[in-house]
Amino acid sequence: LFFTMANIALPGTSSFVGEFLILAGSFQSNTTVCFLAATGMVLGGCYSLWLFNRAAYGNIKVQYIHKFGDINRREFATFLPLVILTLVMGIYPEIWLDPMHVSVQNLLCQIQL
């Protein structure tokens, strides 16, 4: 559920920062495109929640429920760094944005924006 919520750009996750920057930049140049992009993001979020609901609570037969268990230590050790990285990128995105600043400025100068 955490990664589904991160996928739909829950504030505090890495996807929120990316989608916010995209919408802020597109709003300055073309409001119509920004509105269409925001609509697509909302529809994508609805689809992600629908997909999670189907995958997690969908068509499970009672005889197979005993085969599903909770997350084990190995799976937890796999997910924990991903969860931490997703939260760090969402809470403090400057770690990744600051090194890209010079390259983005050079690109903008080349296309004269």
Predicted segments, located by residue:
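Cytoplasmic/organellar membrane-interface segments at the starts of transmembrane helices
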Residues: 49-113
